Regions:
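ATP-dependent adenylation/nucleotidyltransferase module used to activate substrates
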Residues: 2-179, 242, 260-275, 279-283, ...
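Intrinsically disordered, low-complexity coil segments
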Residues: 12-18, 59-60, 220-231, 237-240
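A short, flexible beta-alpha/helix-coil linker loop
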Residues: 98, 198-200, 249-250
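Generic alpha-helical secondary structure
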Residues: 119, 207-215, 251, 255-259
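Short, flexible, solvent-exposed loop/turn segments with mixed acidic/basic and small polar residues
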Residues: 149-152, 232-236
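Mid-to-C-terminal catalytic subdomains of enzymes
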Residues: 164-231, 277
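A short interface-forming secondary-structure element
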Residues: 236-257
């Protein structure tokens, strides 16, 4: 999917105060009316949910999270906690995007097929509960990105994107989260487990489970060796092995000995092939 032209999105509110940005977002949410927020527990959807509860009241808002093998168990637990903090009802929808052969093929547009399945399920929930709209945490930077196939599914289903619609960038989202004192205001982005699998490597339930085990093993090892980590990914590269990506501070703190032990711990989790470490780069295996 090509990036949307800047002319199709409103001016950024990046330089507004948090209070001004909040006023604009709340006004937009009031115009949308009762809705379901497609929720992940991350900062983007949490800001939309927090704003919706403030603008419409908890009785007019529902949060929904798609639960499938691509969702790490820690992320599901986090989403339950955050929804509870915001006073919103959270509905867990079991989805089976992995049953779609186009999703499993992982040919570069996997996110489209995933979002189509997930958002169709959320739209069905909205209809059953008598809520007029579904909203996502898509922000202006997402719309400007070069490769966001999932946005096509959202457009096809007429899902609203209140953050992007008011011109909120990721920086503004963080500012709003701090303004509302959300517990996830500094939470790193945590996309689905399938995002760790290189394009062309089939996405299966077993491979998704392997990614989750590998990241838990890697995180545990680094904690044991007192290496603070903000961003951690274990990328599966098919015949090329795997790559562990860490934020720069963590990468700098990893000694030669710790590096060897980390790669061995990941191999013990069942990941085979040549392993390497690199600086974390968001979307380095975009699909």
């Amino acid at each position: 999917m090509q990036a949307r032209s800047d002319s199709t999105v409103p001016p950024s509110v990046e330089f507004w105060s948090a209070r001004s940005a909040a006023t604009v977002l709340l006004a937009r949410l009031r115009r949308v009316g009762p809705l379901v927020v497609a929720f992940s527990g991350g900062v983007d959807s949490a800001v939309v949910l927090a704003g919706a509860v403030r603008a419409l009241g908890a009785d007019s808002v529902l949060a929904a999270i798609a639960d499938s093998p691509s969702l790490a168990r820690t992320e599901l637990s986090n989403a339950r906690r955050v929804a509870g903090e915001l006073g919103a009802e959270l509905v867990v929808l079991r989805t089976d995007e992995h049953a779609d052969p186009d999703y499993r093929a992982n040919a570069g547009d996997r996110c489209y097929f995933c979002k189509r399945t997930v958002l169709t399920a959320v739209c069905g929930l909205a209809q059953r509960r008598g809520l007029a709209k579904v909203a996502t945490g898509t922000h202006l930077d997402d719309r400007r990105a070069a490769h966001r196939p999932g946005l096509r599914a959202a457009a096809e289903l007429a899902v609203c994107e209140p953050l992007a619609e008011v011109g909120a960038t990721k920086q503004v989202v963080r500012r709003l989260a701090a303004h509302w004192d959300l517990s996830v205001r500094d939470k790193p982005s945590m996309p689905c487990l399938a995002s760790r699998i290189a394009v062309g490597v089939p996405v299966t339930v077993n491979v998704l489970g392997l990614v989750e085990r590998a990241e838990l093993a890697a995180g545990g090892y680094l904690t044991e060796h007192r290496v603070p980590v903000r961003d951690l990914r274990v990328r599966l590269l098919g015949d090329e092995g795997f790559r562990v990506e860490l934020d720069q501070a963590a990468l700098d703190a990893v000694s030669v000995q710790t590096r060897a032990g980390l790669l061995a711990r990941i191999a013990d989790a069942g990941v085979y092939g040549q392993g390497d470490l690199a600086r974390y780069h968001s979307g380095s295996l975009s699909g």
